Amino acid sequence: MLSRQFVREHPETVRDAIERKGVTGVDLDEILDIDEEWRELKAEGDGLRQERNEVSSKIGELKQDGKDEEAQEAIDRSQELKDELQDIEERADELESQLEEALLELPNIPHESVPTGEGEADNVERYREGFDDLRDLPDEVVPHYDLGEDLDLLDFERGAKVSGGGYQFVKGEGARLEHALIQFMLDVHREQEYVDVLPPIPVNSDSMEGTGQLPKFAEDAYRVGARQDDDYDSDDLWLLPTAEVPVTNMYRGEILLDDDLPVKHQAFSPNFRREAGEHGTETRGYVRVHQFHKVELVNFVRPENSYDRLESLLDEAAEVLDRLELPYRVLDMCTGDMGFTQAKKYDIEVWAPGDDMEDGPDRGGRWLEVSSVSNFEDFQARRAGLRYRPERHESADYLHTLNGSGLAVPRVLVAIMEYYQNDDGTITVPEPLRPYMGGQEVIEGSEKIGESAVGAGEKE
């Protein structure tokens, strides 16, 4: 959330952010008008309050002097002022409520280093890693969704039967590989001095508002026990779309001490999102689904340290791919593709060679986003009331929040299935994951179960 004072004093900066981020449905002039009327009413109320205090202070003296008629006039005037003041305060409270709601619709201001652009085509590639020494791949890499079904690692048909489209079963060695990835990621980040958190899965509306998911993106989240389009209040529950929500809000409304900072938490969780994208090859399989696992990295830092921390956070997230020797690139996200809440954002995209896409690298395959690494500055902190006290005797100030996936598990799994694929249709287990799989080096798959497998010629 932007402060009222900032919006009031820098309207053109805010207007520019609205335009550059492509935010629609926001009337900044109306917000400024509400703020101006609110300030005028507050000033008028202060004047009436002062006049009433002066009138009231004379009543006792007038009575003592026997000036009963003048005393009654003062009493009547005091009551008139009280009634006027009540009307003004009620209107001011109404405007303040409107203003608070309107401020939630304003996007964060992009950092000066953010490239200007309208969409993903305008993002700037910062660097690539892992392409100088690629492993030998099969002449034709089988896409993960076909290979996963062939080896009985992924079952989309039964997932749809149980829960609907966009859900899946991860089975056998596929499930073991996913568990291995999760534990490996957590261990990597523990080495980076992250403290583990196991968060609650349902989160309330105040928490969703604190990190910026509400009110802007309510349609993308799963709501518990209510219709999606019903009005919500602070007690309503949502299935978390990312562990960023509960972990950031863990300290909501609190004041941290200067020597607490930086705070670095990591949280593994399932994540739930209604929006599953368009149908087709780009979203087929385990790439864009309604439920997926992720390790989230959340940082709370002093404002002056947040951009140095952003670069370190980027390195911490990317280290998972470095150790797995998976090729990837880092993008500096442009204003039109960076998001509503971010001041600056990097995306880490892993290379998956199984499907050739127009926006993929020259050698074929495609890019899969596995992490967005973001600095929110004090945008989330203002919404959630996250402050720190620089010195014990000083006033509290808003801290800065950052987060990034460390990483999104399904897409890393997809990249492993395609990049570590062998000519015989097996998958080599990356060396760092073998200790988590009992030393297993190769995934060969399992025999399928059921009469349908016999009919399909997949089982004798």
Curated annotation (Swiss-Prot):
Thylakoid found in the keyword field: no
Positions bound to ATP: R273, R274, E275, V289, E369, V370, S371, S372
Subunit structure: Homodimer. The tRNA molecule binds across the dimer.
Binding residues for L-serine: T242, A243, E244, E296, S405
Catalytic activity: tRNA(Ser) + L-serine + ATP = L-seryl-tRNA(Ser) + AMP + diphosphate + H(+); tRNA(Sec) + L-serine + ATP = L-seryl-tRNA(Sec) + AMP + diphosphate + H(+)
GO terms under biological process: selenocysteine biosynthetic process; seryl-tRNA aminoacylation
Compositional bias segments (type: Basic and acidic residues): 43-66
Domain comment (free text): Consists of two distinct domains, a catalytic core and a N-terminal extension that is involved in tRNA binding.
Position of the signal peptide: none
PANTHER family, per database record: SERINE--TRNA LIGASE, SERYL-TRNA SYNTHETASE
UniProt protein name: Serine--tRNA ligase
Pathway in which the depicted protein is active: Aminoacyl-tRNA biosynthesis; selenocysteinyl-tRNA(Sec) biosynthesis; L-seryl-tRNA(Sec) from L-serine and tRNA(Sec): step 1/1
EC number: 6.1.1.11
InterPro entries attached to this UniProt entry: aa-tRNA-synt_IIb, aa-tRNA-synth_II, aa-tRNA-synth_II/BPL/LPL, Ser-tRNA-ligase_type_1, Ser-tRNA-synth_1_N, SerRS_1_N_sf, tRNA-bd_arm
SUPFAM superfamilies linked: Class II aaRS and biotin synthetases (SSF55681), tRNA-binding arm (SSF46589)
Protein biosynthesis found in the keyword field: yes
Protein's cellular compartments: Cytoplasm
Function as written in the Swiss-Prot or TrEMBL entry: Catalyzes the attachment of serine to tRNA(Ser). Is also probably able to aminoacylate tRNA(Sec) with serine, to form the misacylated tRNA L-seryl-tRNA(Sec), which will be further converted into selenocysteinyl-tRNA(Sec).
Key words of the record: Aminoacyl-tRNA synthetase, ATP-binding, Cytoplasm, Ligase, Nucleotide-binding, Protein biosynthesis
Cellular compartments per GO CC: cytoplasm
Enzyme class, spelled out: ligase
Family statement: Belongs to the class-II aminoacyl-tRNA synthetase family. Type-1 seryl-tRNA synthetase subfamily.
Region described as Disordered: spans on this chain: 43-81
Domain of life where this protein originates: Archaea
